[in-house]
Amino acid sequence: MKDMKNIGRIVLPIIILLLTVRINAVPVKAFDMIVRNLPNSEQLPTKELLCIFQDSEGYMWYGTEGGGLCRDDGYMVKVFRSDFKNPGILENNSVTCITEDGEGKIWFGTKRGAYILSKTDYEIRALADETIKSWTITTMTATSDGTIWISTNRHLFRYNESGERTGKYILKWKGRENTVNSIYEDKKQTVWVTQAKGGLFCYDKVKDSFISYPWP
């Protein structure tokens, strides 16, 4: 019951804020919005982007549909993908999500497994976990304790910064197993996850398990 009261203190203000924003929303036409193309968009292998990430050094990383992983330093775009010149770099060139761990390594998911890129030599290695090598990675997040969370195929996995798996979780919402579509760490270093078809969960570090919370 104490946990339920605590979550109420967190979730209720958020709901009220969302309702307030919705009620007081100003029509989009009231804003002066300017949309510009990416400065180096002509250097991208494809115009279809699946995700965008800015690393700790300020560089932009783009995950593309079929074009691999792209790093933009503001002047040039470097592309990492498998092609006839560099076969075997990636099993699949569609990059679905990107994050950065505490050591500065870039982690990224594809439609066939996850990879780790070292920014010192740009070497890419596949995550050595046979379980997820053929699965589409839906989302990933690096948290402050050095954990990398990866969601795929209705499973949530936990890894350390060396790429070793340290946990596997199946989250059920109303009796159904669903894929996690977002992972968030709050200011208190608490990890929250949501599922595609409903479901809000909080990670309990002591019990190494997820607690389900009420959701409409």
Task: Locate each region found by the language model.
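Carboxylate-rich, polar loop motifs that coordinate divalent cations or form catalytic acidic clusters
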Residues: 1-216
